[in-house]
Amino acid sequence: MIDRYKHQQLRIGPVSPQQISAWANKILPNGEIVGEVTKPYTFHYKTNKPEKDGLFCERISGPIKSGICACGNYRVIGDEKEDPNFCEQCGVEFADSRARRYQMGYIKLTCPVTHVWYLKRLPSYIANLLDKPLKELEGLVYCDFSFARPVAKKPTFLRLRGLFEYEIQSRKYSIPLFFTTQGFDTFRNREISTGASAIREQLADLDLRIIIDRSLVEWKELGEEGSTGNEWEDRKIGRRKDFLVRRIELAKHFIRTNVEPERMVLSLLPVLPPELRPIIQIDGGKPMSSDINELYRRVIYRNNTLTDLLTTSRSTPGELVMCQEKLVQEAVDTLLDNGIRGQPMRDGYNKVYKSFSDVIEGKEGRFRETLLGKRVDYSGRSVIVVGPSLSLHRCGLPREIAIELFQTFLIRGLIRQRVASNIGIAKSKIREKEPIVWEILQEIMRGHPVLLNRAPTLHRLGIQAFQPILVEGRAICLHPLVCKGFNADFDGDQMAVHVPLSLEAQAEARLLMFSHMNLLSPAIGSPISVPTQDMLIGLYVLTIGNRQGVCANRYNPWNRRNYQNETVDHTKYDRTNYRYTKEKEPYFCSSYDALGAYRQKRIHLDTPLWLRWRLDQRIISLREVPIEVQYESLGTYHEIYRPYLIVKSVKKEILCIYIRTTVGHISFYREIEEAIQGFCRAYSYDGT
C-alpha cells in the first residue's frame, strides 16, 4: 500500500474483491459503470483501434491520445467550458493519456481460482493454515477429487450414489434420470465441493485465534514428550514442531495485518494498465505484443467458455464443467507464475511465455531494474583502487567525476565569489578547467560528504559515507580497512558514488554513516575494520626485514658469502688468498635519523641497523651469552647479542642500549604508537 502524500511505504498482500473493483471501476458522466474486461480482443484488424470492452478498451483505461476520443473528437483537457467531458457516442472520456499507465481493469471469474503464489510457493501458506498436505490440496484445486460435506437429516448425494451402484435392478433406470435433472445440481452443490471454491470455504471457516491456541498446545505436548530413542520418530517430531511454529507465525501475521485468509482465493482478476503491457510495431509494421496480453486472452477465452456452459445449457455434464474450471485455474496460474513447479507454457515458436512473476522478479524485474536500481542524478561509478595515504574516513574522488557531481555547487560558488557573472560563464570556466575552479571545488568538497555503495547491498555497511578529496586518474581511491564491510577487493570491483543533497541526508551521513563510526559488525558485534589481503601482505613486507641474523656477518671460514672473491681457482687453493670483510651495520640515535637516512636512500627498508633505545632492564636477559664483544680504545666495550647491543664503561656500567631492527619495523612501531596516543588523548578528553 502506498501513502498518497509521502510515498514512503509499499505493502504487497492479498486484496479483497471489493478493493479490486474499487480500483478498476469508474462511473462515466452518463452513470454507466465500466471496468470489467469481457472480450479477449486487443485492436481491430481493419481500423487498428482498441476493441470495446477488450484488453485495450479506451472506455476502461482512458484515451490513447490526450483529449481525443475513439471517434476522433477533440476536447481541451481541464477546460470547464467544454461540455460534456466525455463522448456520448463512444463513451470515452476526454482525459490525459497518462491514465493508461495506472487505470486498471478486472476480469470477473465465473469460478473461484486460488492464487498460485499462496498455494504452490514453498512454504505453502494455504497448506500451512489448513494443515493438509500440499498434494491433497492441489488435487482438490484442479478437480481431481471432491470435498464431501454431508448434511444431517437430509437426503445426501453420497447416499444416492450408493443406491445407484448397489440397489435392486428396478431402480437401475430411474436413478440415472435423476442425475441428469436440475435436482441433481441441488444435491451436488450442497453435498460436494471441489476446485478453488472448496478451498475458499475451508479458509473462510478458519478461526485464526483458535489455530494459534491449538498449535501452541500441540507444540508444548510434543516438547514434553522428549526423545523417543528412534531417530526417525525424533526427526518427524522435530519437523512437526517447526511446522507448528510457522503456522503460528503465519496466523499472527494475518491477524496483525487484518487480512482474511479467503482472499488467497480470487474471484476478480486484476488487469494491468495497457501501457504496462504494450503492443508496439517494429520495422515493417509487424506488431509485437507483451506475453501478458496473450496470457490474459487465454484466461478470458476459458472463462467465457465456462460461462457459456453454465448459462446456455442446463444439461451440461458436471465432469465437463469441472474440466473447464480446471482449465481456467491453469490459465490464471500461467498468467501469475508460468511454470511454477511444472512445465512452463510455450508459444508456437517454443518460447516460454513471460508471466507476471517473471516481469517483477529478478535482477531485470520491474522492482530491481526500474524502481530500486535505476540511474539517479548526482551519482557516478568507477573502479576502486587502494589509497595507502588516505585516512579511514576519506576517499579519493577523480577530478573528472568530482567536477560533474559537484557542478551545480561549483557554479554557485563561482558566482558567489564573483569569478563568473552568470551560469553560462561559470560553465565555460568549468569546461576550460581553470585553476580557480579546482580551488573552489576543494572548498566545496571539504564540507560535503559523499556516499559510496557497492552492489549487492546486503547489509547497512554496503553503503557508507566518506569525506572526498581530489585525486588524479579515473579510479576511486579507498582505504583498505573498509573493504570488508563492502565485501570488496581491488581486483576490478566497481563502486557507485552518490552526493546527498538535502541537509537531512548530509546530517545522517555525518552522524550515522561515516566509515570511522562503523567499526563493528551490526550483526554479531565483531570488528569489521580489520586488515585483510593487501594490508596483510604490506605489513609482512614491511616487517620481514633481512632474514640473515646477527651472526650472518660474523667470520665463518665455511661460509663462502663472507669472502669477496666468489670465483675460486681450485687448482691453486689457498685460504690466505681470501680476505674476510664485514659490512658495517649503521648506528642511529633516534628513529627520526633512521627514517631520514631511508628517505635519502642511504639505507633500504630491510637494512639491519642499530637503534639507540631507552635503558630497559626487561630487554636484557641475564642468562644470554654475548655473541661478540668489541673493545674500544678508551676502555669501553660493546656486548653484541642477537636482538640488542649493550655499551658498557670501564667499570662495567651500562651506558646505553641499541636494538637491532629495520626501517620497516620502526615505521610500523611509530604508526601504532601514534594511534595509541591519539586514542588515549581522545579517551582522556571524553572522561573529563
Swiss-Prot record:
Tell me one Pfam family matched here: RNA_pol_Rpb1_2
Query: Could you state a single Gene Ontology molecular function term?
Result: zinc ion binding
* Keyword tags: Chloroplast, DNA-directed RNA polymerase, Magnesium, Metal-binding, Nucleotidyltransferase, Plastid, Transcription, Transferase, Zinc
Task: Please tell me whether the keyword Transferase is annotated for this protein.
Answer: yes
GO BP: DNA-templated transcription
Cofactor list: Mg(2+); Zn(2+)
- What InterPro entries does the database record attribute to this sequence? DNA-dir_RpoC_beta_prime (IPR045867), RNA_pol_asu (IPR000722), RNA_pol_N (IPR006592), RNA_pol_Rpb1_1 (IPR007080), RNA_pol_Rpb1_3_sf (IPR042102), RNA_pol_Rpb1_clamp_domain (IPR044893), RNApol_RpoC1 (IPR034678)
Enzyme Commission code: 2.7.7.6
Query: Where this protein primarily resides, as one coarse class?
Result: plastid
Its domain of life reads Eukaryota
User: Could you give the cofactor binding note from the entry?
Assistant: Binds 1 Mg(2+) ion per subunit. Binds 1 Zn(2+) ion per subunit.
Q: Which SMART domains match?
A: RPOLA_N
Q: Where does Mg(2+) bind?
A: 489, 491, 493
Q: Where is the protein localized?
A: Plastid, Chloroplast
> What is the reaction catalyzed?
RNA(n) + a ribonucleoside 5'-triphosphate = RNA(n+1) + diphosphate
Gene Ontology, cellular component aspect? chloroplast; DNA-directed RNA polymerase complex; mitochondrion
Subunit relationships = In plastids the minimal PEP RNA polymerase catalytic core is composed of four subunits: alpha, beta, beta', and beta''. When a (nuclear-encoded) sigma factor is associated with the core the holoenzyme is formed, which can initiate transcription.
Q: What task does this protein carry out?
A: DNA-dependent RNA polymerase catalyzes the transcription of DNA into RNA using the four ribonucleoside triphosphates as substrates.
Its family remark reads: Belongs to the RNA polymerase beta' chain family. RpoC1 subfamily.
* Name under which the protein is recorded: DNA-directed RNA polymerase subunit beta'
UniProt organism field: Piper cenocladum (Ant piper)
